[in-house]
Curated annotation (Swiss-Prot):
It comes from Gibberella zeae (strain ATCC MYA-4620 / CBS 123657 / FGSC 9075 / NRRL 31084 / PH-1). Residues 238-255 have a biased composition (Basic residues). A zinc finger (C3H1-type) spans 37-64, 73-100, 101-129, 130-157, 159-182. This is mRNA 3'-end-processing protein YTH1. Component of the cleavage factor I (CF I) involved in pre-mRNA 3'-end processing. The keyword Metal-binding applies. Keywords: Metal-binding, mRNA processing, Nucleus, Repeat, RNA-binding, Zinc, Zinc-finger.
Length: 255
């Protein structure tokens, strides 16, 4: 029989790293639990309060989430020292010691702007904006007049042949396909361009407000600067009504 060829997707998802053994590996394993299986059982003695084996315990020492202090969501970030193999905290590290893209937090830059300057090398999750769109109720019933120009998502589903014939004995528990429901009070479908125009108008209005506030601030700064300069006057610092003479003496008009 021909040997099964592993697909690239399986090689990525089911990747097994090559294990290396060094002279200091036993020390790291006993002191920091480095290299131990993350799926090993949890130590019940440690959870009850004290484990006599300490760091030499072959089981996991996991603190109770109810008694441990909150980490502020840091356990969803990958430990940068662990990526380089230099983390000394081991299982007690508040960061994630696992490189799993499904557990990465969402990239805020990609979410706001629709692109990321780091591209495929970004360590955070890039979610397609199309996946956030709600499903089109007209398409779910069987037909959307706007077709691919609809602003909502068109999800293809297999229809139940028994439901199309008039009756499905399994009802809502049917596994043969979807049961489209008819409704007469649906909102009119909208085009993609209309939603884009509304979004562009909102962005333009916000930009105009920022420009207006910037201009007002510039005018206030200019008025304040002119008021300070006018208060001291031009010549002599007294509105031009006198002259300074030698040795600090001041001679006003008429003297």
């Amino acid at each position: 029989m021909p040997s099964a060829v592993e697909s690239p997707a399986d090689a990525i998802l089911n990747h097994s790293a090559t294990s290396y053994n060094f002279r200091f590996s036993p020390f790291l394993r006993q002191t920091y639990q480095v290299g131990l299986s993350p799926d090993r059982p949890v130590c019940k003695a440690f959870q009850s309060g004290h484990c006599p084996n300490g760091t030499r315990c072959p089981e996991r020492h996991v603190s109770d989430s109810k008694t441990s202090q909150p980490t502020g969501g840091l356990n969803s970030l990958v430990c940068k020292h662990w990526l380089r193999g230099l983390c000394k905290k081991g299982e007690h590290c508040e960061f994630l010691h696992e490189y799993n893209l499904r557990k990465m937090p969402e990239c805020n830059f990609f979410m706001r702007n629709g692109y990321c300057s780091n591209g495929d090398e970004c360590l955070y999750l890039h979610i397609d904006p199309q996946s956030r769109l709600p499903p089109c109720p007209h398409y779910d019933m069987g037909f959307c007049p706007l077709g691919p120009n609809c602003s909502k998502k068109h999800v293809r589903r297999k229809l139940c042949v028994f439901y199309l014939a008039g009756f499905c004995p399994d009802g809502p528990d049917c596994k043969e396909g979807a049961h489209p429901k008819w409704s007469k009070d649906l909102e009119k479908p909208t085009l993609k361009s209309e939603e884009k125009k509304d979004e562009e108008m909102r962005v333009e209005f916000s930009q105009d407000d920022m420009d207006r506030q910037r201009d007002q601030q510039r005018d206030r700064d200019r008025d304040d600067g002119g008021r300070h300069r006018g208060g001291h006057g031009g010549h002599g610092g007294h509105g031009g009504r006198g002259k300074w003479r030698g040795r600090g003496r001041y001679r006003a008009r008429g003297h």
